[in-house]
From Swiss-Prot:
Chain segments carrying region Disordered: 65-94
Family: Belongs to the universal ribosomal protein uL4 family.
Pfam families hit by this protein: Ribosomal_L4
Organism: Bartonella quintana (strain Toulouse)
Any Gene Ontology biological process: translation
Molecular-function GO term, any one: rRNA binding
Entry's Gene Ontology cellular component terms: ribonucleoprotein complex; ribosome
Role played: One of the primary rRNA binding proteins, this protein initially binds near the 5'-end of the 23S rRNA. It is important during the early stages of 50S assembly. It makes multiple contacts with different domains of the 23S rRNA in the assembled 50S subunit and ribosome. Forms part of the polypeptide exit tunnel.
InterPro entries (alphabetical): Ribosomal_uL4 (IPR002136), Ribosomal_uL4-like (IPR013005), Ribosomal_uL4_dom_sf (IPR023574)
Protein name in UniProt: Large ribosomal subunit protein uL4
Alphabetical list of HAMAP family matching this protein: Ribosomal_uL4_B (MF_01328_B)
The keyword Ribonucleoprotein belongs to this UniProt entry's keyword annotation: yes
Amino acid sequence: MDLVIRTLDGNEAGRLKVSESIFGLVPREDILQRVVRWQLARHQQGTHHSQGRSDVSRTGAKMFKQKGTGRARHSSARAPQFRGGGKAHGPVVRSHAHDLPKKIRVLGLRLALSAKLKANDLIIVDELNVKEAKTKMLVSCFSKLGFKNALLVGGKEIDINFSRAASNIPNIDILPIQGINVYDILRRSKLVLSKAAVEALEERFK
C-alpha cells in the first residue's frame, strides 16, 4: 500500500510504499491489551510492604494462661486480630513483571501501527528536523498537520533542535525508532512517523 508523505508545513512530499504485514493487519484488542499490561507490569514499583506478625515489635510471651480465665485461648499479641498486631496476608516487596512471548510482543507492535492507520491517525513526514529550536514555529507546524496530541517517532537519532523545540509542548512525545512501543503509540491520539522511522520498521520486520 502507498501512503502520503508530508512536510512539517503540511505539504505533500511524495508517496511511500509500506508493507501490509506491518500496517495492514486487522487490529486485535486482546493482543494489544496483553502487551500494554506486560509493559506496565514491568514498570510497576513493587516496593509495597506491610508488617506481618513476624515483623511487628511486640512481646512473644503468651498473653495469659491457657485455662481458668474464662476467655478465649490466645498466644501471641502479634496475631492479626489484635490492635498493633501484624497484617494477615499483606503486600510484600516483589516484582510485578511477567513473561510474554516475543512473537506476541512483535505482533502487538504491528497491530498498534495497523490500528493507527485504520483509524486515520497515522501521519508520515519526510523528516523531523528544524533549523532553529523555536517552540512557537513547531506548534504552528503541528497545527498545519492537524494534531495537538501525538507521539512522534524519528530515526536512530533525534534532531537536537527539534527535540528542544518540542520538549515544552504538552501532550507531545518524541522517541527514536529504537524506543517505539505499543503503550506510547496507544496513549496518544496521533502517531507521526518520519520516513526514516518507516524504513527502519520495514527493515526490522523483514
